[in-house]
Protein backbone atom coordinates (compact mmCIF):
# COMPACT_ATOMS: atom_id res chain seq x y z
CA UNK A 1 0.00 0.00 0.00
CA UNK A 2 1.37 3.36 -1.01
CA UNK A 3 0.24 6.48 0.75
CA UNK A 4 0.92 9.84 -0.87
CA UNK A 5 0.83 12.88 1.32
CA UNK A 6 0.88 16.36 -0.20
CA UNK A 7 0.84 19.77 1.38
CA UNK A 8 -1.20 21.96 -0.89
CA UNK A 9 -1.09 25.71 -0.37
CA UNK A 10 -3.74 27.82 -2.04
CA UNK A 11 -3.25 31.57 -2.16
CA UNK A 12 -6.77 32.96 -2.12
CA UNK A 13 -7.60 36.63 -2.32
CA UNK A 14 -10.74 37.67 -0.52
CA UNK A 15 -12.78 40.08 -2.59
CA UNK A 16 -15.64 41.86 -0.89
CA UNK A 17 -18.39 42.05 -3.48
CA UNK A 18 -20.85 44.84 -2.85
CA UNK A 19 -24.35 44.61 -4.34
CA UNK A 20 -25.10 46.83 -7.33
CA UNK A 21 -27.92 48.51 -5.47
CA UNK A 22 -28.57 48.97 -1.77
CA UNK A 23 -31.87 48.96 0.07
CA UNK A 24 -31.56 52.73 0.41
CA UNK A 25 -31.27 52.99 -3.39
CA UNK A 26 -34.35 50.81 -3.85
CA UNK A 27 -36.36 53.05 -1.55
CA UNK A 28 -35.67 55.95 -3.93
CA UNK A 29 -37.63 54.20 -6.71
CA UNK A 30 -41.15 55.26 -5.78
CA UNK A 31 -42.77 56.78 -8.86
CA UNK A 32 -43.85 55.79 -12.38
CA UNK A 33 -42.04 58.36 -14.50
CA UNK A 34 -43.39 57.40 -17.93
CA UNK A 35 -45.30 54.76 -19.86
CA UNK A 36 -46.05 53.88 -23.48
CA UNK A 37 -48.23 51.20 -25.09
CA UNK A 38 -48.30 49.62 -28.55
CA UNK A 39 -50.34 46.73 -29.93
CA UNK A 40 -49.19 43.64 -31.79
CA UNK A 41 -50.66 40.47 -33.29
CA UNK A 42 -50.44 37.72 -30.69
CA UNK A 43 -50.49 33.98 -31.16
CA UNK A 44 -47.92 33.91 -33.98
CA UNK A 45 -44.13 33.81 -34.24
CA UNK A 46 -43.80 37.60 -34.38
CA UNK A 47 -45.94 38.02 -31.29
CA UNK A 48 -43.80 35.44 -29.52
CA UNK A 49 -40.68 37.43 -30.39
CA UNK A 50 -42.25 40.61 -29.00
CA UNK A 51 -43.08 38.85 -25.75
CA UNK A 52 -39.66 37.19 -25.52
CA UNK A 53 -37.77 40.47 -25.99
CA UNK A 54 -40.09 42.31 -23.59
CA UNK A 55 -39.53 39.70 -20.89
CA UNK A 56 -35.76 40.08 -21.24
CA UNK A 57 -35.84 43.76 -20.26
CA UNK A 58 -38.49 43.46 -17.56
CA UNK A 59 -37.24 44.68 -14.16
CA UNK A 60 -33.99 45.90 -15.69
CA UNK A 61 -32.15 48.30 -13.39
CA UNK A 62 -30.00 51.24 -14.48
CA UNK A 63 -27.96 53.18 -11.96
CA UNK A 64 -27.25 56.91 -12.50
CA UNK A 65 -24.85 57.33 -15.42
CA UNK A 66 -25.22 53.70 -16.55
CA UNK A 67 -25.86 53.10 -20.26
CA UNK A 68 -28.49 50.69 -21.58
CA UNK A 69 -27.78 48.64 -24.70
CA UNK A 70 -30.82 47.02 -26.28
CA UNK A 71 -28.71 44.48 -28.15
CA UNK A 72 -26.95 43.40 -24.97
CA UNK A 73 -30.24 43.21 -23.08
CA UNK A 74 -32.28 41.11 -25.53
CA UNK A 75 -29.60 39.40 -27.61
CA UNK A 76 -28.30 37.38 -29.13
CA UNK A 77 -31.24 37.32 -31.52
CA UNK A 78 -30.95 33.63 -32.40
CA UNK A 79 -33.19 30.58 -32.17
CA UNK A 80 -31.45 29.19 -29.09
CA UNK A 81 -32.34 32.41 -27.25
CA UNK A 82 -36.05 31.91 -27.85
CA UNK A 83 -36.50 33.82 -31.12
CA UNK A 84 -38.36 32.59 -34.19
CA UNK A 85 -38.55 33.52 -37.85
CA UNK A 86 -41.01 36.31 -38.63
CA UNK A 87 -41.23 39.28 -41.02
CA UNK A 88 -38.42 41.84 -40.64
CA UNK A 89 -37.61 45.04 -42.55
CA UNK A 90 -34.47 44.74 -44.66
CA UNK A 91 -33.47 47.41 -47.19
CA UNK A 92 -36.96 48.85 -47.17
CA UNK A 93 -38.70 45.51 -47.77
CA UNK A 94 -40.42 42.93 -45.58
CA UNK A 95 -38.56 39.62 -45.59
CA UNK A 96 -38.57 36.58 -43.34
CA UNK A 97 -35.86 36.75 -40.69
CA UNK A 98 -35.00 35.61 -37.19
CA UNK A 99 -36.41 37.79 -34.44
CA UNK A 100 -39.00 39.75 -36.37
CA UNK A 101 -40.85 41.85 -33.78
CA UNK A 102 -37.94 42.73 -31.47
CA UNK A 103 -37.89 46.25 -32.91
CA UNK A 104 -41.43 46.86 -31.69
CA UNK A 105 -40.11 46.43 -28.17
CA UNK A 106 -37.17 48.79 -28.77
CA UNK A 107 -39.49 51.35 -30.38
CA UNK A 108 -41.98 51.14 -27.50
CA UNK A 109 -39.12 51.58 -25.04
CA UNK A 110 -37.80 54.50 -27.09
CA UNK A 111 -41.08 56.36 -26.66
CA UNK A 112 -41.16 55.51 -22.96
CA UNK A 113 -37.61 56.82 -22.63
CA UNK A 114 -38.42 60.10 -24.41
CA UNK A 115 -41.51 60.60 -22.26
CA UNK A 116 -39.14 60.23 -19.31
CA UNK A 117 -37.03 63.12 -20.61
CA UNK A 118 -34.06 60.90 -21.46
CA UNK A 119 -32.22 61.34 -24.77
CA UNK A 120 -30.81 58.43 -26.79
CA UNK A 121 -27.06 57.93 -27.11
CA UNK A 122 -27.56 55.70 -30.16
CA UNK A 123 -30.68 55.28 -32.26
CA UNK A 124 -31.53 54.57 -35.90
CA UNK A 125 -34.88 54.48 -37.63
CA UNK A 126 -36.08 51.63 -39.83
CA UNK A 127 -35.51 51.92 -43.58
CA UNK A 128 -39.29 51.57 -44.00
CA UNK A 129 -41.85 53.26 -41.74
CA UNK A 130 -43.56 50.95 -39.24
CA UNK A 131 -47.19 50.93 -38.21
CA UNK A 132 -46.94 50.61 -34.43
CA UNK A 133 -45.35 54.03 -33.67
CA UNK A 134 -45.34 57.38 -35.52
CA UNK A 135 -42.58 58.14 -38.02
CA UNK A 136 -39.49 59.43 -36.31
CA UNK A 137 -40.30 57.59 -33.10
CA UNK A 138 -39.08 54.10 -33.99
CA UNK A 139 -35.78 52.50 -32.98
CA UNK A 140 -34.37 49.59 -34.97
CA UNK A 141 -31.88 46.87 -34.12
CA UNK A 142 -29.53 45.08 -36.52
CA UNK A 143 -27.41 42.64 -34.54
CA UNK A 144 -23.74 43.49 -34.76
CA UNK A 145 -24.21 46.77 -36.62
CA UNK A 146 -27.07 48.90 -35.27
CA UNK A 147 -27.91 49.18 -31.58
CA UNK A 148 -30.29 51.31 -29.54
CA UNK A 149 -28.82 52.88 -26.42
CA UNK A 150 -29.55 55.48 -23.78
CA UNK A 151 -27.96 56.53 -20.51
CA UNK A 152 -29.69 57.05 -17.18
CA UNK A 153 -29.20 60.80 -16.77
CA UNK A 154 -31.19 60.96 -13.53
CA UNK A 155 -29.69 61.46 -10.11
CA UNK A 156 -31.59 58.31 -9.11
CA UNK A 157 -31.73 54.65 -10.18
CA UNK A 158 -34.40 53.71 -12.70
CA UNK A 159 -36.17 50.44 -13.44
CA UNK A 160 -37.77 49.31 -16.71
CA UNK A 161 -41.00 47.33 -16.33
CA UNK A 162 -42.64 45.55 -19.25
CA UNK A 163 -45.88 43.67 -19.83
CA UNK A 164 -46.69 41.94 -23.11
CA UNK A 165 -49.88 39.91 -23.17
CA UNK A 166 -52.86 39.43 -25.49
CA UNK A 167 -51.44 41.72 -28.16
CA UNK A 168 -50.76 44.68 -25.86
CA UNK A 169 -47.21 45.79 -25.01
CA UNK A 170 -46.78 48.32 -22.21
CA UNK A 171 -43.41 49.58 -20.98
CA UNK A 172 -42.94 51.74 -17.90
CA UNK A 173 -39.95 53.54 -16.42
CA UNK A 174 -39.91 53.91 -12.65
CA UNK A 175 -37.60 56.15 -10.63
CA UNK A 176 -37.86 58.83 -7.96
CA UNK A 177 -40.74 61.31 -7.82
CA UNK A 178 -38.21 64.15 -8.15
CA UNK A 179 -36.39 62.68 -11.17
CA UNK A 180 -38.21 64.88 -13.69
CA UNK A 181 -37.90 68.00 -11.53
CA UNK A 182 -41.51 68.90 -12.26
CA UNK A 183 -41.14 68.87 -16.06
CA UNK A 184 -43.57 67.02 -18.35
CA UNK A 185 -41.76 65.76 -21.47
CA UNK A 186 -43.42 65.10 -24.83
CA UNK A 187 -41.75 63.96 -28.08
CA UNK A 188 -43.17 65.32 -31.34
CA UNK A 189 -42.31 64.32 -34.91
CA UNK A 190 -42.87 66.69 -37.82
CA UNK A 191 -43.30 64.64 -40.98
CA UNK A 192 -42.77 65.92 -44.51
CA UNK A 193 -42.87 63.25 -47.18
CA UNK A 194 -40.46 60.50 -46.16
CA UNK A 195 -38.59 62.68 -43.67
CA UNK A 196 -39.44 63.07 -39.98
CA UNK A 197 -37.79 65.58 -37.66
CA UNK A 198 -38.24 64.64 -34.03
CA UNK A 199 -38.11 67.09 -31.13
CA UNK A 200 -38.42 66.65 -27.40
CA UNK A 201 -40.31 69.37 -25.53
CA UNK A 202 -40.57 69.93 -21.79
CA UNK A 203 -43.33 71.83 -19.99
CA UNK A 204 -43.60 73.10 -16.43
CA UNK A 205 -46.67 72.66 -14.24
CA UNK A 206 -48.24 75.79 -15.75
CA UNK A 207 -47.86 74.49 -19.30
CA UNK A 208 -44.97 76.78 -20.20
CA UNK A 209 -42.39 75.31 -22.57
CA UNK A 210 -39.09 75.19 -20.68
CA UNK A 211 -37.17 72.68 -22.81
CA UNK A 212 -36.71 72.05 -26.54
CA UNK A 213 -34.28 69.69 -28.23
CA UNK A 214 -34.03 68.43 -31.80
CA UNK A 215 -33.35 64.72 -31.39
CA UNK A 216 -32.97 63.28 -34.85
CA UNK A 217 -33.90 63.38 -38.53
CA UNK A 218 -35.33 60.11 -39.81
CA UNK A 219 -35.42 59.34 -43.53
CA UNK A 220 -37.57 56.49 -44.86
CA UNK A 221 -37.81 54.82 -48.25
Task: Please name every model-derived segment.
Residues 1-221:
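Well-ordered beta-sheet/strand-loop patches within structured domains
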Amino acid sequence: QVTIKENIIINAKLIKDSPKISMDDLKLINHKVSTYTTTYGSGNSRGGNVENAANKIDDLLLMPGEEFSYENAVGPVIASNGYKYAPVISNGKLVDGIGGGVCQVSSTLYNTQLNAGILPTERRNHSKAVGYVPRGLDATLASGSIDYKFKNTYEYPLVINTKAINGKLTIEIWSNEDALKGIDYKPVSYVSGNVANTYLYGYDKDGNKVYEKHIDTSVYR
